[in-house]
Amino acid sequence: MITHGFYARTRHKHKLKKTFIMLSAGLGLFFYVNQNSFANGENYFKLSSDSKLLTQNVAQDRLFYTLKTGETVSSISKSQGISLSVIWSLNKHLYSSESEMLKAAPGQQIILPLKKLSVEYGALPVLGSAPVVAAGGVAGHTNKMTKMSPDATQSNMTDDRALNYTAQQAASLGSQLQSRSLHGDYAKDTALGIAGNQASSQLQAWLQHYGTAEVNLQSGNNFDGSSLDFLLPFYDSEKMLAFGQVGARYIDSRFTANLGAGQRFFLPENMLGYNVFIDQDFSGDNTRLGIGGEYWRDYFKSSVNGYFRMSGWHESYNKKDYDERPANGFDIRFNGYLPSYPALGAKLMYEQYYGDNVALFNSDKLQSNPGAATVGVNYTPIPLVTMGIDYRHGTGYENDLLYSMQFRYQFDKPWSPQIEPQYVNELRTLSGSRYDLVQRNNNIILEYKKQDILSLNIPHDINGTEHSTQKIQLIVKSKYGLDRIVWDDSALRSQGGQIQHSGSQSAQDYQAILPAYVQGGSNIYKVTARAYDRNGNSSNNVQLTITVLSNGQVVDQVGVTDFTADKTSAKADGTEAITYTATVKKNGVTQANVPVSFNIVSGTATLGANSATTDANGKATVTLKSSTPGQVVVSAKTAEMTSALNASAVIFVEQTKASITEIKADKTTAVANGNDAVTYTVKVMKEGQPVHGHSVAFTTNFGMFNGKSQTQNATTGSDGRATITLTSSSAGKATVSATVSGGNDVKAPEVTFFDGLKIDNKVDILGKNVTGDLPNIWLQYGQFKLKVSGGNGTYSWHSENTNIATVDESGKVTLKGKGTAVINVTSGDKQTVSYTIKAPNYMIRVGNKASYANAMSFCGNLLPSSQTVLSNVYNSWGPANGYDHYRSMQSITAWITQTEADKISGVSTTYDLITQNPHKDVSLNAPNVYAVCVE
């Protein structure tokens, strides 16, 4: 049987030749291997009056016979010696009852059992006699059957008779060649006629045993939607059918071939079968295994299929920036027909596939583990034509509707039964559907995943001393090139740190400016980064951990996080000791049994040990003694640290002399304005007692003492303390030293002077890319950026009036309401300044699209009085879609209050805040105009 149909399909070409070579090779091999098995199938002949039928009901040997004038089923039964019960058993699907069969009129078809046919070879003409041309078109051949299969010939001819028959054919041809009465082409025609008749017989025998061939051709769109399928029996008996099925299809711009085999086992009233398929998508290089089962009865079919991928992830054939592979899944199918009205059929199917991004409906609608149920009806008015409609409803409310029409031409049957309604019933029976195609999804359902076209990785966290600048190591892989990296460093900025671009040409060259170390605080900050490529694709968010220390160290390994002395001074007698304690942690967790090495960085002293191991609390201790007066600095380091951590300096003093035992500053940063002073304090002791009225000499390498000079003396008070102040009018770093007569210099911790923090009065209007004064007419959600300088270079922002204006971490201000707002900025060195936003003369607020009347109501009759009002806003702020809130909009056409002339004409005027484009005489019910209010 060959069918032709059309379906709704779309879309590419290529690899067609490869596909058909594969099919041709498969079919050729199949025909070669199975050429003898075809000879034992069904045979179709026209019956002559002297043909004899043997009454053996064999499913493979059936005769489709059309009653002639004067013939009835009863007369055929008597003349051929076939019982009516046998004939009825073969015709139940054609007639509603035996009595109806007996009423069959001339021209109607019945099925008769066929085993052997009498063939009269004696009808051949004697050699040399005049030729007789039969209806078949072969001269001298009076065979009363127009078609004869090889098995019938073999069954009715002994070897001798077959040889005799062949000899007679040859003799007949020789006689005709000798006859002078024949014209020159007659011999050739005769030979070709004999050969053609035999070839037609062979071809018909092949065609009627092919089972089913289904062809669907779509003439448009490069034949997208076309398919070709064959079911080919290679072993066929009454109770079992073994078959192969091959197919190819070009659907959605993909060439897919299917190769399968299976068996069907026929019981008296039902059929059980199984099949195995390999599906190959040549376009996308996808391979899938299919395993299915079948259960059929008269008027009912069911099947279940499982689909299992045999190929893995690879670049998608037709979906950019995605990989694809076959999705695993299954489907269950049911088809039923009404016995009383077999032309009408119904279909029910459920399919389920598994994966995160499966294209069950199409590659633009990816779903997770999608399923779909299909219901359909079909109508077959005559065997030649079937029309159907299917509705499929799936996960996520996806659905589609498919209309189809098939034309089925069966080579094994005459034309008449294919266009008469009463023969539809046969298609619905087991015998009539014996060679039907396997019901399965021959298209490979695919699963997709987004390619890693852009990835961002930060392999190392950052650990550094306060106020240091640390380079961030970024690893970026981008298919289309890196455009930018967006950071969320709000936690870092809140303490005066920030992430900033280094200013190089590379888009991935960033550095971290660390804030001040907070004594007793966690000093650990989390920042995130996301990369964007030149096509707008974004990477995953990546987190960076920044740990700030009071001195240089690295702690993403096992490292010393804190190193302190139990006192600031001791006797330089070689006996009194200062005890240091080092705390070792990894990622904030104390570490036991870690060796810590100690070293004297500066000064003269002796360590109690060069190393120690941490206890259960992560603590390691060491003592320091000295017989030499002076200042000493000690460091601690683990094996995994790249630099040691220094403790604060300690002082060894000579007890019998007045000595400085302590020096400190009240802060480590100051404003370089000549006024912000750092106060230094020293303590002078002798024999364990404070020394009163003793002179202390101070020196500095930067700034001025008391605003006068870089050297200054101060006198101790009754508590033995002397103080002095240091200021600077320029930015820089200062180291102050102090000494007493006969003693050593003692250095204080380094102090940094920063320029004063200030905000420029000029702002950057972001949508217009200009710098100037803040306009006194506002566009709601307009944005500008404040420019700040001074401080330590790290800033945090805060708005005191967020209902009026908000500010982000970069100093970008967004206007939200009409009024006055104060924006504060604080630098990492704790300087704070403010910027006051003054209320505007008026503000423009954009509402929704509305008719003129509704717009007036929405705005409380406060529409713009003229186009000039909005033109001024445009001139001050630029196009509205230059700001985040309006970024996606292409037009904001706004109503203008009607003039008197407008009221008479029943129209109004508009102005567009994005394109300008002023209009007059606009209908008051225009659908795409916004209510824009003036506040």
Curated annotation (Swiss-Prot):
Q: What is its main location?
A: membrane
Where the record annotates domain LysM, the positions are 63-112
- Any Pfam family the entry gives: Big_2
Q: Which residues form the BIG2 domain?
A: 790-834
SUPFAM superfamilies given in the database record: C-type lectin-like, Invasin/intimin cell-adhesion fragments
Region described as Sufficient for homodimerization? 40-153
Q: Where is this region: Signature sequence for beta-barrel assembly machinery (BAM), which recognizes the unfolded beta-barrel in the periplasm?
A: 402-411
Q: Offer one example of a GO biological process linked to this entry.
A: cell adhesion
Choose one Gene Ontology CC annotation of this protein and give it: cell outer membrane
Q: Give the signal sequence positions.
A: 1-41
| Gene (name only) | eae
For this protein, the record's Gene3D superfamilies field holds: 2.60.40.1080, Immunoglobulins, Inverse autotransporter, beta-domain, LysM domain, Mannose-Binding Protein A, subunit A
Subunit structure comment from the entry: Homodimer. Interacts with Tir.
Limits of the Big-1 domain:
560-653, 660-754
Q: Where in the cell is it found?
A: Cell outer membrane
Return the similarity comment.
Belongs to the intimin/invasin family.
Give the start-end ranges of region Peptidoglycan-binding. Answer: 40-153
Anything further noted? 'Inverse' autotransporters have an N-terminal translocation domain followed by the passenger domain, as opposed to 'classical' autotransporters which have N-terminal passenger and C-terminal translocation domains.
**Which cysteine-cysteine pairs are annotated as disulfide bonds in the entry?**
859-933
- What does the comment on domains in this protein's record state? Has a signal sequence, a periplasmic Lys M domain, an inverse autotransporter domain (residues 210-411) predicted to form an outer membrane-embedded 12-stranded beta-barrel, followed by a linker domain also embedded in the outer membrane, and an extracellular passenger domain (residues 450-935) with a tightly-folded proteinase K (PK)-resistant, non-Big domain (residues 450-550), Big domains and a C-type lectin domain. Linker domain is important for the stability of the beta-barrel and spans the barrel pore in an extended conformation creating a large cavity on one side of the barrel pore.
Record's protein name? Intimin
Task: Tell me the NCBIfam families matching this sequence.
Answer: intimin_all (NF033627)
UniProt keywords, alphabetically: Cell adhesion, Cell outer membrane, Disulfide bond, Membrane, Repeat, Signal, Virulence
Give the protein's function.
An inverse autotransporter. Adhesin, which mediates attachment to the human intestine epithelial cells. Necessary for the production of attaching and effacing lesions on infected human tissue culture cells. Anchored to the outer membrane by binding to peptidoglycan (PGN) via its periplasmic domain, thus helping in receptor interactions during host invasion. PGN-binding may also aid in resisting mechanical and chemical stress during transit of the bacterium through the gastrointestinal tract of the host.
